[in-house]
Amino acid sequence: MRDWDYRWAANSVSTSLGVFWGEEMQHRVGVPARAADISIEEYVATKATPEQLLQALAAASDKIKNDFGSWNTPWGEINRFQRLTDDIVHPFNDAAPSIPVPFTSSTWGSLASFGARAYPGTKKWYGTSGNSFVAVVEFGDKVRALAVTAGGESGDPKSKHFNDEAERYAAGNLREVYFYRPQLTGHTERAYHPGN
């Protein structure tokens, strides 16, 4: 942890320990923080004892070991993207395919936010909140933009666009957005004309 650069990464053990430690501290100091009328973060920074901080780290390490077999489990083995069905309440399943996601919840300062947690019957954490769409736009003589959606454009599990952007989303690999007719050449599956 001393060598951690405080950046998330799929291969980062420190991210795993840091997030699990933070979750543990939230549970341990929530009540006294409210009683002191300060945020949990302020309480941890100003009132938590070294013993409390270390006990929470030991508990976090134990939880990771119990759930994943080793305390030094990389974040990407824990934090996953999974889209199996179009259900609003998703049936997450550790045995089914999923994709590692390097970024964390905005709770931990991540601008690319992926709010994940374990669900009933799972040990891995699956994201259900955060950025569902990310775009950057350059304005000028011509508009230029890059974007990605979480999963894919379609809500139909039978569509090739149901999950086709999941890997790209997890990697932060934004695709070009086509605004102009010449950009659309070779990239159009079908055309729609209102009234026809």
For each of these PLM feature ranges, what is it?
Residues 1-196:
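Long, compositionally biased non-active-site segments enriched in small/hydrophobic residues and glycine
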